[in-house]
A protein has these predicted regions:
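Structural and coupling elements of P-loop NTPases
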Residues: 1-235
Length: 235
């Protein structure tokens, strides 16, 4: 192994040759590829910060006027401004009994125990039917396999929220419970491709229809591109 590593320009200390496979591989790859900060360095160099890019992003996805206090707070990425969160994805909770909402905080600071308004995709200032009041039961910094619990998350960050998913179908806009200005939503997500597969299903046992419908609703909430429709055919 020493000969092979030296041919690659990798030189280890004598004690490192006695390491187990996993830590030994880590040491070898660290010398071969260099420090693991390359991706982070690339992000810092080329990806604009939330504060620098907020104004451009708001103009693309926000449906409300841009001369309001809410819009100005979002464009400044103000952690002290009115709360506005764009929920873009739902993930199964750890017990698989419901969903947690993943979104970006554009303004304000969301805190656990806070009561918020959840605005659905069909909400408008003239028709507030698609709006519910929900209490944030948990807040996490979501890191794929890991969820880091936090008391609050300020503007400019992504957050995973528990306890607010019941009325969310695909995406939603979260705003604080009370504010002096009208609330507007973010545009629903748009995808460049449409679904290419259509499947008709029915339960083998008609009495299990409610279970199947509940499963379809969960699929509809889990996958943004999926569309489910229920048709009752009388025979």
């Amino acid at each position: 192994m020493k000969k092979t590593l030296r041919s690659l320009g990798i030189r280890l200390k004598e004690k490192e040759y006695g390491l187990n496979v996993k830590p030994l591989l880590r040491v070898v790859l660290a010398q071969f590829f260099g420090p693991p900060s390359g991706f982070v360095d690339m992000v810092v160099e080329h990806v604009p910060s939330p504060a620098a890019n907020a104004s451009k992003r708001i103009q693309q996805i926000y449906t409300g006027p841009l001369d309001t206090e809410i819009a100005e707070a979002m464009q400044k990425c103000d952690p002290e401004g009115p709360l506005v969160i764009h929920v873009t994805k739902l993930y199964d909770n750890e017990e698989a009994t419901g969903f947690d909402a993943f979104g970006r905080v554009f303004s304000g600071t969301v805190k656990t125990g806070q009561t918020v308004r959840v605005l659905g995709e069909s909400y408008t200032i003239d028709d507030e039917e698609d709006m519910t009041m929900q209490k944030v039961s948990n807040a996490w910094i979501y890191e794929s396999r890991y969820r880091v619990p936090v008391d609050g998350v300020p503007a400019g960050n992504w957050v995973l929220l528990g306890g607010i998913d019941s009325s969310i179908i695909k995406t939603a806009t979260i705003v604080q419970q009370k504010w002096k200005e009208d609330a507007y939503i973010f545009r629903p997500l748009r995808f460049p491709t449409a679904a290419t597969l259509k499947v008709a299903i029915e339960p083998m046992n008609p009495s299990e229809l409610p279970k199947m419908l509940d499963g379809l609703r969960r699929i509809n909430k889990s996958y943004p591109v999926v569309t489910t429709k229920v048709r009752i055919i009388m025979k």
